């Protein structure tokens, strides 16, 4: 983390530099003009993690600054949501004098929402006992006078939920409220307002679609729920069990009735589609009945494996969201032989860092 780089007065300049890098880096694929979606310059991150430093009676949050090569005390944190910044102060003031809650505490994680819920995870280098649970419950009650908060305690092979281990986010996408269960310690989009722009862009990019949608790496259904309106049916895959559970929950609370989630990896699904192997998890699902002309992928930073790339090339339209321009560029070396880029976007999910979230719509040549 480079804390000095987080200067809102430099936001436009750093975004312009990202635009230049992405445009120049993908020029060989002759994409259309880059669509740029900016972030708020401050208080844009809905998640934050802090280490905890103990110094006598004092106790405080810190981060490690790679540029300074030193730990930096954090009373407030500019990228974090206003809700995280508000509870940071109240929480640390509660922890300092409380031996049971502070003893061997080494990290605090926050997961907040635009809808006002916040989840606090306290991580310890010791096993948590009954006294900890009593003190944590009292802490939650005191904080609840100001915040809609839940607390989780974690230690090695131990997790204690005082109430629940998730928040429910509500966002407005093209005027429609969408609800998402977000589970502690599972992936969620960190920049909620930019995530809304991503969803709206994806909806617009697929609005003229026909037939069904195949989605790989669907996570908690973030895009699945939003895109379902543009297709007859959606078939989505995800490997992580907590994310599949959250996706099923999100399908239900959003009253979406045309989505089928399958718990399996993209690689295994590629084998199933190629009829190389049969899978018990696909019993009762007729893959041949789906008429998927469009495929949506939002892979991890490592990008897409070769076999899955071959699968993807079989579709007329490919919507690809990437958190790593290098692996996207590598994958496009293959995909560009059969498809051309017709939409190209930069989403500034991670201001003041080198990370760039991008999106491309590819259509068969």
UniProtKB/Swiss-Prot annotation:
Coiled coil: none annotated. It catalyses: uridine(54) in tRNA + S-adenosyl-L-methionine = 5-methyluridine(54) in tRNA + S-adenosyl-L-homocysteine + H(+); uridine(341) in tmRNA + S-adenosyl-L-methionine = 5-methyluridine(341) in tmRNA + S-adenosyl-L-homocysteine + H(+). Gene3D superfamilies: 2.40.50.1070, Vaccinia Virus protein VP39. It comes from the Bacteria. Its EC number is 2.1.1.-, 2.1.1.35. Transmembrane segments: none annotated. GO terms for cellular component: cytosol. The active site is at 323 (nucleophile), 357 (proton acceptor). The keyword Methyltransferase applies. GO terms for biological process: tRNA methylation. It is an enzyme of class 2 (transferase). The keyword Methyltransferase applies. One of its GO terms (molecular function) is rRNA binding. S-adenosyl-L-methionine binds at residues 189, 217, 222, 238, 298. Keywords: Methyltransferase, S-adenosyl-L-methionine, Transferase, tRNA processing. Belongs to the class I-like SAM-binding methyltransferase superfamily. RNA M5U methyltransferase family. TrmA subfamily. Dual-specificity methyltransferase that catalyzes the formation of 5-methyluridine at position 54 (m5U54) in all tRNAs, and that of position 341 (m5U341) in tmRNA (transfer-mRNA). This is tRNA/tmRNA (uracil-C(5))-methyltransferase. It comes from Shewanella denitrificans (strain OS217 / ATCC BAA-1090 / DSM 15013).
